[in-house]
Amino acid sequence: MSLTVVSMACVGFFLLQGAWPHEGVHRKPSLLAHPGRLVKSEETVILQCWSDVMFEHFLLHREGMFNDTLRLIGEHHDGVSKANFSISRMKQDLAGTYRCYGSVTHSPYQLSAPSDPLDIVIIGLYEKPSLSAQPGPTVLAGENVTLSCSSRSSYDMYHLSREGEAHERRLPAGTKVNGTFQANFPLGPATHGGTYRCFGSFRDSPYEWSKSSDPLLVSVTGNPSNSWPSPTEPSSETGNPRHLHVLIGTSVVKIPFTILLFFLLHRWCSDKKNAAVMDQEPAGNRTVNSEDSDEQDHQEVSYA
């Protein structure tokens, strides 16, 4: 086996001591793969186990293979402890599901909870499948998209990956149609584009995948509100409710304003009318009033 590490020891010595470490004493660490978990044959991959708990040792275990449990001294930097397990030349017998654990020096029999599982897959072993998009690689926003992965090879499972995402989607291959086996991955209404690839695998070797399909760029154009009418945005035949809301709102504001304006105009006109009537009184009345006023003035002078 070509699994190499800076320093390692089989944790089997615990069995020789007649004791198996207790798990779950500390929080689980994290397990990452650099540059990624899909590895071509003969390439190098680094499995990094790290934690904010200051573990003195890290153990790496592959499911189903007890003898593949490896141990490394942890490195401490900036409040983080970590260990890098290096697979220098990827081979089929090194693919599988890995987990890591942490332990401290004063309690070597007590391990942390296991990290989340990490599947290391070797790719490029079989013929590449084809990847296509329905209705096409360029779609309107909100339009339903389905990606079809197909091949003449009788793959049992297809795997769809998207650049920038850590996990793949998988579907079993359907029945043979026109000489090909395929799986259809519905993506639902399109919102964002992306670059996709797909792989094929067989049931008896789930960690050994085919070559990657050619990359497929899915582009999304347009605005969902413009491209796809919604209950709040029907077609022009039924009118636009947003415009209707604006009109209704404007009308509600205008009605009381109009009533108030009418009331003010009516009052102003009434005042003007009364003023005009006063101006048109007979001259006799005005004379009498004047004489009465003079008469009163004379009386006041007499009394003086």
Swiss-Prot record:
Glycans are attached at residues 67, 84, 144, 178. The keyword Signal applies. Residues 1-21 form the signal peptide. Disulfide bonds join 49-100, 149-198. The keyword Amino-acid biosynthesis does not apply. Residues 265-304 are cytoplasmic. Keywords: Cell membrane, Disulfide bond, Glycoprotein, Immunoglobulin domain, Membrane, Receptor, Repeat, Signal, Transmembrane, Transmembrane helix. Residues 22-245 are extracellular. It comes from the Eukaryota. SUPFAM superfamilies: Immunoglobulin. The chain crosses the membrane at residues 246-264. It is found in: Cell membrane. It is a single-pass type I membrane protein. SMART domains: IG. GO terms for biological process: immune response; immune response-regulating signaling pathway. Receptor on natural killer (NK) cells for some HLA-C alleles such as w6. Does not inhibit the activity of NK cells. This is Killer cell immunoglobulin-like receptor 2DS1. The lineage of its organism: Eukaryota, Metazoa, Chordata, Craniata, Vertebrata. The gene is KIR2DS1.
